[in-house]
């Protein structure tokens, strides 16, 4: 059993991007669906879909990774911020833009999983899950 499924998801994405895979498969959960949805809305992946195999109890998410016209990575870095041993929460006023607006932080809020831009716009704070640039 893994202790941090979100870190596992981010590591799978990071590894797939490094070897330029067109997609990556990740075990599904509600938070991971939210993360994938934010990555799609913010333009870091093309799309995602959930698939379920009959012999497996848990479905999985297939993320279609995005690359530039010359094969350059859209996701340059992706890292976990709030960890199981050290949770990090931020108010909306404390959420500063990542790389001058070129990157995002993904926040888990009472309204679901959203980007830092949406959190600032809606004036909602929450747990800072990760940072993508």
UniProtKB/Swiss-Prot annotation:
GO terms for biological process: translation. Keywords: Ribonucleoprotein, Ribosomal protein, RNA-binding, rRNA-binding. The keyword Ribonucleoprotein applies. Transmembrane segments: none annotated. GO terms for cellular component: cytosolic small ribosomal subunit. The keyword rRNA-binding applies. InterPro entries: Ribosomal_uS8, Ribosomal_uS8_CS, Ribosomal_uS8_sf. One of its GO terms (molecular function) is structural constituent of ribosome. Belongs to the universal ribosomal protein uS8 family. One of the primary rRNA binding proteins, it binds directly to 16S rRNA central domain where it helps coordinate assembly of the platform of the 30S subunit. Part of the 30S ribosomal subunit. Contacts proteins S5 and S12. This is Small ribosomal subunit protein uS8.
């Amino acid at each position: 059993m893994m202790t941090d499924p979100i870190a596992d998801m981010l590591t799978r994405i990071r590894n797939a991007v490094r070897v330029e895979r067109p997609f990556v498969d990740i075990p599904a959960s509600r938070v991971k669906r939210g993360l994938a949805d934010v990555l799609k809305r913010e333009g870091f992946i093309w799309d995602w879909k959930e698939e379920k195999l009959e012999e497996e109890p848990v479905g999985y998410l297939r993320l279609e990774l995005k690359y530039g016209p010359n094969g350059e990575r859209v996701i340059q870095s992706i890292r976990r911020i709030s960890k199981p041993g050290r949770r990090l929460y931020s108010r909306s006023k404390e959420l500063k833009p990542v790389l001058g607006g070129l990157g995002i932080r993904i926040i888990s809020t009472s309204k679901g999983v959203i980007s830092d831009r949406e959190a600032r716009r809606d004036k909602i704070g929450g747990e800072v899950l990760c940072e993508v640039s």
